[in-house]
Amino acid sequence: MTTRRDPFGPRVGSRIGSSGVGGAEYRRAVADNWHSIGLPPDALAEIEAAGIVLPDLDVVRRYRLDRVREQLRELDYAGIVLYDPVHIRYASDTTNMSLWTAHNPCRYLWVGAEGPMILFDYGDAAFLAGHARLVEEVRPATQWMYELSGIEMDRSLRRWSAELVSVVEEHGGGNRRVAIDRASPDAIHALEGRGLELRNGGEVMEVARSIKSPEEVTLLRAATVVTDRSLDAMRAALEPGITELELWAVLHSENVRRGGEWLETRLLSSGPRTNPWFQEASARVIEDGDLVAFDTDLIGPFGMCVDISRTWIAGDRPPNAHQLDVFGRAEEMIHHNMAMLCPGITFRELTFDTFVPDVEEFRHYTTQFHGVGMADEWPMIVYPDTWDQSGWDGVVEAGMVLCVESFVGRWGRGEGVKLEQQVLVTDTGAELLSSYPLGLR
């Protein structure tokens, strides 16, 4: 059964988007139970105090949908089927249990190169798309994952594939080339068995997401304010005697109470656990003089990702010579490599011409740069010693938002330092998005 937009009732978000989103207008929409993840008053006040005026969200939605359709037309695809909840949100600005649906493929979106956009949602949840004016139709999703369909999975796959093929035949203009971002082998076989030519949806979405509009950048700035204020609370809580988990929980709590959504990782470590990198927060008690390194990996308001890293020192003890040495190298790497960013520079140049401490003496991170927007994104720019294995070339463009990465820790001994800055590539270079200090204190 098809659910049209009309049964949603009043467009609870209809005040948003007519002439921009002023603070009072935004508050009225939230008070009217606008079915889109919004901001609490305190967070909105912090954002406004930073001089940020939230953009017209309908402009953001239109830009993103246009970006997806531009890629579909460029690649000559009839459309794309999206399961990744971040991809669904980018194209339609709809959500439904984002983390749960990230590992339970139970809702999906069809975006046609020439239209329409049809959301197949989980449960009786059409109302969740009430604010999403560009979603032309909402239908109940057909469930083929084993958890929901059990021994009748094949029957569910036949029904699911038949409905999608019907959409392609109705709206694809005879084109049977369709992208899909993720699916099980059974689902792929079901679609191919009905004559569709499947293509990689990751390429479509990553390239579409790589160039941010001015309005998207404003949303990133708002999420950065939320992150910076959350880091203030986290820094105030850092005292010898607190555990890594307790400190990490401050960041998570402060983000959520300001309208943020989740943290992608648990990357916070202290003292000897800072080297090598990628140890997750533990019950270790932080001691006086320990380095404490963390990566925010934060999904904030509007689903925007703020991915910055800091390394602090706990307590009143001054940093020792080793701590100052590795911090200085990591900081030099950040400043030097960030200064290289400009439109036209190639991924290869950003691999081989950057400043990197001697890899025979120091460990390094997995990437030197990576894209960011609604999560970590394309491109991922690696190190010279991993170029042959996982590097590729490309060109940096204005409008990209990139993270500049650094981890420095000696092989076999001593603490490590993790630093990371998030920048907007402009016509004249790199603009730092977070004003949070980089220092140990």
Regions found by a protein language model. Give the residues of each.
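Active-site neighborhoods and metal-handling regions in enzymes and metal-associated proteins
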Residues: 1-441
